[in-house]
Every structure is written in C-alpha cells, then in structure tokens.
Amino acid sequence: MPKTKFRVESDLLGELQVPADAYYGVQTQRALNNYKISTTQMLHYPEYIIAIAYVKMAAAEANAELGVLDRTIADAIVKACQEIVDGKFHDQFPVDMMQGGAGTSVNMNANEVIANRALEIMGHNKGEYQYCSPNDHVNCAQSTNDAFPSAFRYTFVRMNRHVEKALSDLIASFRAKGQEFKDIIKMGRTQLQDAVPMTSGQEFNAFANNLEEEIANLERNAVLLKEVNMGGTAIGTGLNAVPGFAELCTIRLSEFTGDKFEKAPDLVEATPDTGAYVSYSAALKRLAIKLSKICNDLRLMASGPRCGLHEINLPPMAPGSSIMPGKVNPVIPEVTNQVCFKVIGNDTAVAFAAEAGQLQLNVMEPVIVQCILESQTWLINVMNTLRTKCIDGITVNVEHCYEMVKNSIGIVTALNPYIGYKASTKVAKEALETGRSVYDLVLEHGLMTQKKLDEALDPKAMTSAHAFIK
C-alpha cells in the first residue's frame, strides 16, 4: 500500500490537507496559503525559533508543577522544546514573518510542531491530538498575546548580544588603527573647509569612542525587553491561567534560558504596550546613524586618487566601473551606508506600528518583529564586513597628509596666541590670494622669529592643548 503524501487535519474553518511528514499542522498550513508576502520566513531566524521553544518549555513545566498539565504530557513537551532549542525541526517553521492576526500564525506554528513531536516521543502518530493538543496542552494557560511577545522579546535579547559583539569587534579595529596612526599628522576640517591639524590616530580613536557609547545604550534598552507578560493570556486579565502561573512561568523561563526575566507588574498594561520595542529600535537607529556618518567620512577621506582628499587607502574589493578603467570604489562603506538607511527606515515602521495599537492589543507586532530582527541581522553582518574588509586594511598616505598640513592656511590658527586674531586673518587672506605659505609670510612681515614660528607650528604642539610663551 503506497504511503500517503498528506494527512487531513481540521480547525474552525474545516478540513485541510497537511503534508504527511510535516510537524506543523492545519493552522500553519492555512498561514502558508494566506501569507505569501515577504519571502522571509520564521525559519530564517533560528534565535526566534529557539526563543519561542523556551517560552513553551517554561509554560509546560509551570503548568505541570501547578497540577494543570499531566506530567507525562508536560515532559514530552519539554523534551520536544529542548530538541528545538538544540537546533532540530527549524525547517518546520515556514510561516511568513509578515502576517495578520497579531502573531497567531507564529504561535500556532510552534504549538503544532511541539505537539506533533511530543506525540512521537509518547509513541503516537502526528495529528493524534487527543493525546497532546497544540491548543489544550502546548498552549495551556497561554494566548498568542502573551506567548508571542514574550518569545520575540527574548529573541531581541539574544540577538542583541550578537549586535554588541560585532560592534565591540569593530570598535577594537578602530582603536587598533588609532594606535597605528597616532603619529601621522593630517588636516582637520569643519564644514569641509581646512580647520586645524590633528593626527589620523585622533580621528580613528574618535570613531571608536563614538561607537563605544552605543554598547551602553543598547544594553540599557535591552534590559527593558526582559519584562514579560506570560500569564496575562488574552488581554492581561489572566483568564484560563491558574493563580501563580504568571510568576512560576517567568521563574522557569529565567532558569531555562539563564536570563533574568521579570513579570510585568500590570499585565493588562503590558499586553498592548510596545514602548520597549520603540526604545530598542531607536537604539539600533542611533547606532546606524553613527555608523553611516563614519562611512561618509571614510569615503570622503579616500576620495581621489588624484583629484580628491586621498588621505587614506581603503582595501580594493572589486573593480569599480564597467567603463572607466582602473577605477576602484569604496564599496564596503557604501553598503554600510545603505544598511544604515534600511535600519533607519525600519525604525520608522516600528514607530508607526507601535502607534497603531488599539484598546487591549497591538495587532501590528509582526511587522515590529520583522523590522527589528532585520535591523539586528543586517547590522551584525555589515559591521563584521566593515571591520574585516575595510577598517582592518586601511592605510594612510602619510607624506600627502603632511604636505596638505604644511601648505594649509588653516595652520594660521595656531598663531593666534602669538600674533593675535587680526594679524593672523591678514596673513591668511594674503596666503589665499598669493598662493604663498603662511610660514613664509609670517617671517617676511617680521611677525615672529623663525625659532618661535617653528615652535608654534610644531605638528605635535598643534594637535593637543599645550602651554605657549609669546
């Protein structure tokens, strides 16, 4: 007898064929039929799948301890969840990240996969839900409205660690370049005009310090995500959850994951609240803005090679033109800029979705999840790419940078304490009009002795605070 390719399952809307070997069930199949939207599936985010497995594991254990769920069924659910945490069955989470229903399809996808695997563990066949039901057992004392946000909050926390790691590595790369370039003199600029001298090391250390602030900012906002509303069920009132479940489930979730979670003090308030997502997304946006600005600087400093600033050399990664021979473009900073634009756009979508909540639930949470996970993933990837394919290989055109400083009118600023602002202005104007150097004009007009002028224009003296004697 040939093996059947499908099994038939039923729900509120009737019967539906499900692939016989699938661990998901009828409601996941409906979601697959309904939402062919983004081509981004839940299975593309392993951390998301792991997080929801932990939530279901904690709920099953808490329900068993409270006498609500049969211990044999609970143990099978916990074992199935552990297998998912260990990386199994991730291909059984095919639902589109973009969906209606406030995340119900995600929740039921998890419930069905866990139930069917638990059935096998107990010696039953997939779909024999009288022994372990996706709704009655795996989803016991839960609603999508508490299990779904608790899962993606934990997902964001897990992903944030990877964001911070990639950021820390990038900062270390900038610091290494700061040390490498500490004695290289270059011209600083404000408003794209020559300002005063600095070192390339100061510039790259500034990049590192600028980004360092974002680690603390990400951590501050990630803490907000560790408040969960498990036990609130549908709208936060706790209907169908026994007393003590909310507290115990949160404790077990903390134990299983190794992260400290807190039960929200007001579950009715917490159920529709999206404030933590808005804050965390804004932290990602702030990081993106800083990264993009740094990449703007890198592209400008690398401009040339003959007709631009040509201060630094970026590692050549690809031929730059199909028509212009020999052209090499700053492709890694460029792709970083574009990722940052996407993160900024995602944050705008998060803000609109957060504002769109109504009454006791915000049904727009799926797009919030998709946007934040995409922002985290893209930032991780692009920061690693920027570090390994750009920053680590940057070199400085030392002689060219020094020649620009030596020939710059901007160095006249260092003479203000010696000859005064008015005289310095006259020298600067004459240098600009005649093309002569500031150095020669100061000596010609007898404004300073050569010895004093050499001291005042000493490169090291010009790049830091120092005492001066008129």
Regions found by a protein language model. Name each.
Residues 1-470:
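Conserved, well-structured ligand/cofactor-binding cores
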